Amino acid sequence: MLKQMIEFLINCWPSLILTALAAYLLGSLNSAIIVTKLFSHSDIRDSGSGNAGATNVLRSQGKLPALFTTVGDLGKSMAAVFIGGLLVSGLNSSYTGGSMKFVLVGKFLAGLFCIIGHLYPLYFGFRGGKGVLTTLGMMLILDWRVALICLAVFTAMGLIFKMVSLGSICAGITLPILTGIFGRLVDGNSAATVLFCIAMTTAIALILIFKHIPNIKRIIKGTESKIGSKK
């Protein structure tokens, strides 16, 4: 498997670069910024917490803009993963033969770079959101079981402790663990495939935690905004 993967990377790198670029550009379409400009002609990054995400839109702009933001963030990452799979399989059909393990590389790569685009959007001065909904959308395509359990963890922690950020952090930590459990113990995938998936989801989890460092500091101090707060 390792030898095949190395050969795949050597032979198919142009399509992988194209996939990463397309996903990044798609991810750079930050829904919170776009929706807020359309609804109130303002920049969401100048309101509330300053984060370009659905939670801040809900607190600062209301339910309808937050709904559009949520749909946009979920939709773009789902589209990116779908496009990534098509690009890698379509442009390298003679090499991959439609093998799912190679298509999986394209999908994960697209999801990762879509998240990076959301965090550091090219069109908006590289100041974006935290990538929680974008990650959820990606995982709904890659493994809906993992996505739904992570969503349940997010919801439970959020409701118990009244902090969206804590729910996001806990869901991020859970992501690579569940990926390994389902990939190996439930689906019986090869060790190499499972390790690749764990590596990718671990990278995403670390990105999510990194973006939540200010929240973690406020949680420790007891000053983090809670559900229902306008701050």
What are the residue ranges of the model-derived segments?
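Short, non-helical or kinked segments that cap or interrupt transmembrane helices
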Residues: 42-54, 123-136, 163-172
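Hydrophobic alpha-helical transmembrane segments
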Residues: 13, 17-21, 67, 104-112, ...
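Cytosolic, membrane-interface loops and tails of multi-pass inner-membrane proteins
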Residues: 33-66, 217-231
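Interfacial segments of multi-pass membrane proteins
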Residues: 58-62, 84-88, 113, 131-161, ...
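Transmembrane alpha-helix interface/packing and boundary motifs in multi-pass membrane proteins
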Residues: 22-28, 33, 115-125, 157-165
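Short, strongly hydrophobic alpha-helical membrane anchors
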Residues: 1-14
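Multi-pass membrane catalytic core of lipid/isoprenoid biosynthesis enzymes
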Residues: 59-86
